[in-house]
Amino acid sequence: MQKIMHISVLLSPVLWGLIFGVSSNSIQIGGLFPRGADQEYSAFRVGMVQFSTSEFRLTPHIDNLEVANSFAVTNAFCSQFSRGVYAIFGFYDKKSVNTITSFCGTLHVSFITPSFPTDGTHPFVIQMRPDLKGALLSLIEYYQWDKFAYLYDSDRGLSTLQAVLDSAAEKKWQVTAINVGNINNDKKDETYRSLFQDLELKKERRVILDCERDKVNDIVDQVITIGKHVKGYHYIIANLGFTDGDLLKIQFGGANVSGFQIVDYDDSLVSKFIERWSTLEEKEYPGAHTATIKYTSALTYDAVQVMTEAFRNLRKQRIEISRRGNAGDCLANPAVPWGQGVEIERALKQVQVEGLSGNIKFDQNGKRINYTINIMELKTNGPRKIGYWSEVDKMVVTLTELPSGNDTSGLENKTVVVTTILESPYVMMKKNHEMLEGNERYEGYCVDLAAEIAKHCGFKYKLTIVGDGKYGARDADTKIWNGMVGELVYGKADIAIAPLTITLVREEVIDFSKPFMSLGISIMIKKPQKSKPGVFSFLDPLAYEIWMCIVFAYIGVSVVLFLVSRFSPYEWHTEEFEDGRETQSSESTNEFGIFNSLWFSLGAFMQQGCDISPRSLSGRIVGGVWWFFTLIIISSYTANLAAFLTVERMVSPIESAEDLSKQTEIAYGTLDSGSTKEFFRRSKIAVFDKMWTYMRSAEPSVFVRTTAEGVARVRKSKGKYAYLLESTMNEYIEQRKPCDTMKVGGNLDSKGYGIATPKGSSLGNAVNLAVLKLNEQGLLDKLKNKWWYDKGECGSGGGDSKEKTSALSLSNVAGVFYILVGGLGLAMLVALIEFCYKSRAEAKRMKVAKNAQNINPSSSQNSQNFATYKEGYNVYGIESVKI
């Protein structure tokens, strides 16, 4: 095989020259392959032929070497760089990884590799192999391992081991880490035998093999040879090629074997490739002509596709890339990086395609993201996919294991008894239930859920209502369970599908599925009456302090305007008038007296203005800043005014559990038997403990027998009773007529409803998988929307509030009319006072003039008196009066 590789390497320039010819569109690609990588090299060549187009050709320059030899890697890398390659594909190990990454970062040459992912950031290194750490940790947690041995190959790096040890320290796992990377081939049989004997003494029956295919095959051979470490043992093969190893030897031995697979043979893209791959000639393409492909070979094929796509994108962007005149010595001092290497690195990282290894996408560090790894188990009929792991969904189990033997026949022939409880909207009696029989009498969320579970698990069922109407709690004296939990514990029912909360004490006696609904304890109170805006609610958009500041600002601005107008010489002016034929000048006047200043400021604030304006610069500055001030204030006021006038707010007496615990006026309680009461009884949090102390000693009792009783108590208490219940039920009742309850504050805890089965029931696993599948399909959310909101009776606003919040009533703006009427009345009163005052003054003046006329009745005096009278009379005439 190695001879074939050597011949292909020596003849590669000739072969590729014949295939592609000499073309200006030829792109030189370097290749560093370890000796013995026959299949990887064949996949590389197939990719070159497959993805080359008429636009350009990828021309490879291949070097076959020992990747563990840093000197050989340095020579090969420098040789590739001096040939003017645009990018290099190749492999590395722990001894050569630093050399390659250093050259790439210094010379700006991109290196695409399917080797193990490195920690940290390495510029110009594109890693095709996804990181396995997250999937491995998820699988360990899925199997609930807390003690296991970890056999690792040092050539693959220690990052995965470090992640396992970090999780072990956090979750208190017992991990025995053993390095099998440096085992001498001559003594490997003896070494492995001694190793497994030590594991047997330590009772380590769970083993993780963090090794590549050849090392895994060696270990499996020794396990079979020894014969003691097969049945009852569980092995996890921690690489991405579960089907690459020779598992036939251990398939029927009784051991549990799990692992990971990056190449999904059920995928249509992989199937088409395998059809072509299996037809290739073994002599021309060593390692081909098989029905499978190693995951490293698949990553090699994908790497060629990534490079091709990157150069195609550069062509589309009309970015010219050339190595002419840039091929130099990589050992030059100082090193001269390739100027256009950054463009190629950017193009490679931006590639997103579908390949043999699934979705191929990279982050800014050149590492794979958004990938999916299949979870595999070895069955008697061969490797089988049981689920998958992704960065978003984490581990998802998709294989449903049906009960075997008599359990299957029993499940198919038996009618499963499903216990539940009458609780809206989970289980309700239909209006015409007297005319119906069996399961048709019921409707609700859990009724629909039971039908879906039965359909997925393949059994017939009968719905029964729990006799005592309780969920399930253990009596403190007799230790007997009641409710639905009791029916499961004492064999009266096979499964409970109801709003049954998953708790620790219940989990000790029954099994729960994954939660089908998440919720928490919440507070229900009677909805307070909506407070209508007050008569003077138009003042609410601004706080009381702001209104006071505005008043002081108004007075201050008026005074400042008055003062600057008095001090500024440019504010004084002389009025001229004609007296016969001559023009006369009166004395200097100033329009901005204190009253005119107040009037000017008021007009500006009301956005109206007045008939006078400042003449001086100082006065205009005062006016300008006042206008700016009023612009912002009025705009802010107007923006908030609509909300304050149209929205009828509900003022809740409490907003949280803290508010409840700090007062005694409003009583509060829970269901007398259930998880909510148990939560407060066991809680060590000060607030909840204080609430429990109150509820336990309150008279009359604040506990209720049913949720319906608790809701009725809330509605009849006129706001003096709060009921603590699950948030889902609270939200449902809030949507039911008479729409007089509401949920306040956030949830007090976080928990979930689960489907319960007796301990060890054959239904448990099937039901759990059915719940997961329904959740993935979005059916659980659809059911909740159907029974909570689609059938709601109060609307989104709760009742008939929509029209009330869209139109203003007279009460909203009554204060404005009051001010208008008050202003008009005040104006008339002031006018009357002015008239009376002026009339009295004129009467006195006329009386004085008349007396003077009687004493000295001269014509001049009469004329003067008449002029005086005329002047006073014209106050109410056309002539203006200056203040």
UniProtKB/Swiss-Prot annotation:
Glycosylation sites: N256, N370, N406, N413
Cellular component GO terms held in the UniProt record: AMPA glutamate receptor complex; dendrite; endoplasmic reticulum; glutamatergic synapse; membrane; neuron projection; perisynaptic space; plasma membrane
Modified residues annotated as Phosphoserine in this record: S683, S717, S860, S863, S880
Residue ranges within the lipid bilayer that do not cross it: 592-607, 608-610
Span of the signal peptide: 1-24
Keywords: Cell membrane, Disulfide bond, Glycoprotein, Ion channel, Ion transport, Ligand-gated ion channel, Lipoprotein, Membrane, Palmitate, Phosphoprotein, Postsynaptic cell membrane, Receptor, Signal, Synapse, Transmembrane, Transmembrane helix, Transport, Ubl conjugation
Coiled coil: none
Main location: membrane
Membrane topology according to the record: Multi-pass membrane protein
Modification comment: Palmitoylated. Depalmitoylated upon L-glutamate stimulation. ZDHHC3/GODZ specifically palmitoylates Cys-610, which leads to Golgi retention and decreased cell surface expression. In contrast, Cys-836 palmitoylation does not affect cell surface expression but regulates stimulation-dependent endocytosis.
Other facts: The postsynaptic actions of L-glutamate are mediated by a variety of receptors that are named according to their selective agonists. This receptor binds AMPA (quisqualate) > L-glutamate > kainate.
Protein name: Glutamate receptor 2
Lineage: Eukaryota, Metazoa, Chordata, Craniata, Vertebrata
